[in-house]
Amino acid sequence: MENVVTPDQGRATALATTLSLLVGWFLLSVWLALHDPFGAPGQPPFGIAIILAVPLAVFALDSRLHGPLFDGLRRLDLASLIAVQAYRIGGVFFLVAWRAGTLPGAFALPAGFGDLAVGLSAPFVAAAVAARRRGARALAWTWNIVGLADLANALFAGVTHSRSALGVFAGSLPSDAVGRYPLSLIPIFFVPLAILLHIAAMRRLRAAPASP
């Protein structure tokens, strides 16, 4: 008798495949973080550009071809895609590094408080979406846009306050510590992951305009 895959089985398989990919990506990120992928001072920040571009390109291609790599992510409901970004409270480590004198406030304060705000609000926005409260769709759009803007601002501040060729605002205390392990895991893994989650959430919002 021919085996029939139920929707629940298909979803479980897709989630397992995507989770395996994320674990492998994280382990690769740890290896990269331990091997200084951002280059020497004074050089263009090609490292961060590649680290951001590769997962985004793979995600775009996989989505275009309806591939299996990120199918689990695409199958998550909107509330789950938002709730998982509670991990952004990890931005508190930027504030700890600032207090310790290893990161400049011009970078650490907006990046740290921005991530904290996004991470702390994620469960509440997700709950509003799951309960289909009035205005939840607009709230979800706003939250995703603010979350992406926070990431863009942090990347801009990190690069321009570094000792790279684009470090036009670098002072006596550059942002180079964020390029060293363990802080480097944030731009290497957690920032690209957050971008993918925002994109997946906004695609779901756009696909279901009447009911997020």
Task: List PLM regions with ranges.
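N-terminal membrane topogenic signal
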Residues: 5-21
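Membrane-interface helix-boundary motifs at transmembrane edges
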Residues: 6-11, 38-41, 66-78, 131-138, ...
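Hydrophobic core of alpha-helical transmembrane segments in multi-pass integral membrane proteins
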Residues: 19-32, 48-65, 151-155
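Short, membrane-exposed interhelical loops at transmembrane-helix boundaries
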Residues: 164-184
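Hydrophobic alpha-helical membrane-insertion segments
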Residues: 140-157
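A glycine-rich, hydrophobic loop/mini-helix early in the fold
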Residues: 40-103
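Hydrophobic cores of alpha-helical transmembrane segments in multi-pass inner/ER membrane proteins
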Residues: 51-64, 117-126, 185-203
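Membrane-proximal helix-loop-helix units in multi-pass membrane proteins
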Residues: 84-140
